[in-house]
Amino acid sequence: MVTNGYDYTTSFLESYVNAFGKDPSNINNVFKFSRTWYNELARRNSDPSYEKWRVNNRNVYEYFGNTNWYDVFYKDYTTGHQHNISVTGGGDVASYYVSGRMFEQDGIYNAGDEKYQQFNVKAKGIVNVKPWLRVENTTDFMYRYSPQPTSNTGISTTPMTVSRMLNHQAYPVALVTNPDGTWTEAAVYTGWAGFVEGNSWRKDRKFDMNNRTAVTIDLLK
């Protein structure tokens, strides 16, 4: 993964010029590009003592960063815990088995409280109706819950997932915040700003149920 802003921009520029025969006006559709800015990026890349931002003559922030957006979003590790319980019983005529599982994993992001939770219940019963007739029924339930950050940017009427916007708007050359503490466009468009502030996310819930019934007839009894 390329996290050096100059290397990333140079590769993008070469690809764009080879494809279209001219310089781009933007990197993708948001981040402004010009040769003047690119030359300044090269100068600041060669001397780490320079700031990774400046205010241009239009009083607009320009960025010259080396941001690893995956480090911004994701934790290095996470933890989880699982609990299981089962009950079984019965006799010659009928028997049963019931099990339950609860799994919870801490969030993978550096912001928000998006723990993943999953609950499973399985129940199985067997009834020997006759020596030659057996009926079995098995039912499974599974419930999953996970909140996820999203990006509401105006680019699409549908909120975009973080993974999509990281590919689209997380330029290494961009910074996360401005010197005055405000969010950069990249932080807003990737969804990071909204997720940190708690106003841009979705809750994914899914419930599954399966039921299976089997009848066994032994014609030899």
Where are these regions (language model features)?
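Aromatic side chains
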Residues: 96-97, 119
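Outer-membrane beta-barrel transmembrane strands
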Residues: 75-95, 101, 193-221
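Surface-exposed loop/interface segments of Gram-negative outer-membrane beta-barrel transport/assembly proteins
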Residues: 1-66, 103, 107-210
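C-terminal beta-signal and adjacent terminal beta-strands/loops
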Residues: 2-3, 72-74
